[in-house]
Amino acid sequence: MGLDNSKNTAKFFDLPKAVHGMNGTTPVNGFKATALSKASRTMTKTSALSQFLEAYRELEGYKNGRAIKVDGQTLSIAAVAAAARYNAAVELDESPLVKERVRKSQLAIANKVSTGASVYGLSTGFGGSADTRTDKPMLLGFALLQHQHVGILPTSTEPLDVLPLQDANNTSMPEAWIRGAILIRMNSLIRGHSGIRWELIEKMRELLAANVIPVVPLRGSISSSGDLSPLSYIAGTIIGNPSIKVYHGPSKSGIRQIGSSKDVLALHNIEPFPLESKEPLGILNGTAFSASVAALALNEAIHLVLLAQVCTAMGTEALIGTRASHAPFIHATARPHPGQVECAENIWNLLDGSKLAQLEEHEVRLEDDKYTLRQDRYPLRTSPQFLGPQIEDIISAFQTVTQECNYLPATDNPLIDGETGESHHGGNFQAMAVTNAMEKTRLALHHVGKLLFSQSTELVNPAMNRGLPPSVAATDPSLNYHAKGLDIATAAYVAEATPGPTHIQSAEMHNQAVNSLALISARATITSLEVLTSLIASYLYILCQALDLRALQREFLPGLDIIIREELRSSFGSFLSSEQMEKLQQNLTSAFEDHLDKTTTMDNTDRMTTMAATSSSVLLQFFTDSGASVPPSSCDLLSSVSSFQSSVATRSSVLMDDLRKEYIFGDRGPTPASQYIGKTRPVYQFIRTTIGVRKHGSENYNKFYNGLGVEDVTIGQNISRIYESIRDGKMQSIIVSLFD
């Protein structure tokens, strides 16, 4: 069975509609409901696509002015991202039930203090020092904050005398992480299990509203008894500790002002809030930083796993691949893992309408596809099987971290039952749930990167890319190595996006003998996200170039047919019939196209000359076997062959050169491949027009007449534009448009 692209518009299957479609709920033809297992049917509720679309819409609502409500149970990952990255408004649920729940918990603690009860963290020391006792809970709170303010931070904003080995600011966390942590800690405290006052939660909201954010050390948490040290800097800001630094004011050149928390609070008319009783411990004993960084990571990860499917669809088009690899029978019927089914369905639908991908598979005879690749290679053909498990792991992690932000009880110790007054000593601060979510997310990101790297390196390799030039060069390859550097860079990216594990060490007098390292794991996942984004941006850049080259090929081949027809008539028309001319043209066209596919490493003139020379064997075979009349003189025939070859070579070379020039310099418009692409078209057009990454090759075409960097920016600068569009969320709106 071979492949035929002659009926691209026909439906592959005419099956009943499936349980869900491109938006996660609407059926799409081809995926048969009766074929799905029970596990697969749950995908309608938990697909990566539906979660991505829901999160995107929610985030847009917050960006457009909707306030995030802190009520202890409805905080979403999108809400964390909105507060952390877009300074969205935050309001507390001030309903009587919620406020009473907090009040009862605080009263329970006050009663224990007044009666002299022994309660961990109020009358005892901490961790391995819990055998000490004191009746001074206020001073104990100061001692707690003091011993946790141990992080390394820049001591000055002035330039260093000696150039640092790394960014001097890389010892502190990004503000987004800290804002997210404040929000999540508020959401935990408002549940009323921590014995704190309502006014403390209000003060934390006030910090967010004023955008006064503590400078928090990047390192120092093992996320065992919560993220103790990072959270202590939030507590230090609340009380106005003059030694705690905070960000404040408008951003200048991307950097905000830094000042003493005491001075900045006064500048913003915010009263310091002295902490009482259990409140220092209530702030510190929690997983807020781990959950914040994890939530921000997953908000990006779920986008990237969908973008990977879009890249795979575009790669299928660029490599003239087949949609049949994603047929419903293979996935929804034969092996219905939910992630695999979702991935196959998405790619199947994205390829709809493509004039490059082969949309149908037909039976052909053995001799018709002899010596041709029978099927797509693994990076395309098995992409649903490879990406599917990653989708499932990211969905699972998404749900776990959402739960961590909400539905678990407070994550400090002890927990206070306001209804009974009981205190419960446990370990909800142990953030292993977040760690596991991040480990599986990071492993998933690595696998996504590995798949896309394999697709990318196949696309730039002339031995594998089905007739594209080496390194997707738009001009003569002897002086154009366009994507060769990218092939190396993407290898580096996928190597750096390693899922390397975290290593637990016993800590704090062996009291914390096991610890989750959740924040460390989440930080590593953020790094993996950044590296994977670099890889995806590079691949998208290569894909757009490859699609333009395919469009050029689609224009060149009809032009070549005209040249063959006209030169056959000129050289052999006097002694060949119309039928013979037609047959000969078919033979020559087949031979020339086969030659062009195998000679993409040659420069244009040499390539067309050797292509024309292959006509000798075709012509000899034709005149020997067809019984065609030939000129009485063999010299006349040889002269006709020579004239034909020379004219074909010259005209073909000129045609290719003209098309190259028109494509490179925009005479065909900024998006010449649009007419050939399926539903991935908006991504290609966004890159080419909205962010202005045009086809590469102008400097090479003009033989570097003006030097480097005059006619075009560097390859890396163009990829940086794509990278930034992914990181700042602009690409998300394009991906939504593909599926919504």
From Swiss-Prot:
The active site annotation covers: 120 (proton donor/acceptor)
The EC number on file is: 4.3.1.24
Pathway linked to the protein: Phenylpropanoid metabolism; trans-cinnamate biosynthesis; trans-cinnamate from L-phenylalanine: step 1/1
List residues of cross-link (5-imidazolinone (Ser-Gly)).
224-226
What's the protein name? Phenylalanine ammonia-lyase
| Subunit field text | Homotetramer.
Among InterPro entries, the record links this protein to: Aromatic_Lyase (IPR001106), Fumarase/histidase_N (IPR024083), L-Aspartase-like (IPR008948), Phe/His_NH3-lyase_AS (IPR022313), Phe_NH3-lyase (IPR005922), Phe_NH3-lyase_shielding_dom_sf (IPR023144)
Q: Which organism is it from?
A: Amanita muscaria (Fly agaric)
